[in-house]
Amino acid sequence: MKYKLKQIAEIINGSTPSTSNSEYWDGDISWITPKDMSLQMKRYISNGGRNITQKGYDSCSTTLVPKDTILLTSRAPIGYISIAQNELCTNQGFKSIICGDKVLPLFMYYWLSTKVDFLKSISNG
C-alpha cells in the first residue's frame, strides 16, 4: 500500500524569534537549529544551543512539536534527521514530521535516512 507523506503525518515548519530582543531568549522552551543537529549527530535530540522564552514562542510562528516528532533539516545542511526526545521547537530550517497512527516514528526515521541523497539532489534544483 502506498501513501503520500501528508496522508500519514503532519508536516510542521519552524520559525525564529527576533534575535535582537533579549526577552525572547534563555527561557525554558527547547529550540533546535540545523547547527545543533550537525553538532550532536544522534538519533534523538532534546535541546540545542539556545532556548526560547514563552514571549519568544508567542512572537513567531514556531510550533511546539511533541515527543517522537521527526526533525528533518531542509536548509543548509540538508538531510540531518533526529527524533525529538521531548517537546521542542525548531527554526525555519526544518520540516518537522508528526507521525500519525499508520507509521511508527522510528520507522519514519530509518526510512528518511535512506532518502537523504535523494532529498539533497532535489533541493539543489
Task: Please report, for each region that a protein language model flagged, where it lies by residue.
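Non-catalytic DNA-recognition/assembly elements of restriction-modification systems
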Residues: 1-15, 31
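Short alpha-helical functional segments enriched in proximate histidine and acidic residues
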Residues: 15, 118-119
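Acidic/polar loop patches that form or flank catalytic/metal-binding clefts of enzymes
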Residues: 18
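Short acidic/glycine-enriched loop/turn segments that link adjacent beta-strands
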Residues: 26-28, 90-91
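A short beta-sheet element
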Residues: 33-34, 49-115
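Short, basic/aromatic beta-hairpin or loop at an interaction surface
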Residues: 38-51
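Short, intrinsically disordered, charge-balanced linker/junction segments flanking boundaries
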Residues: 120-125
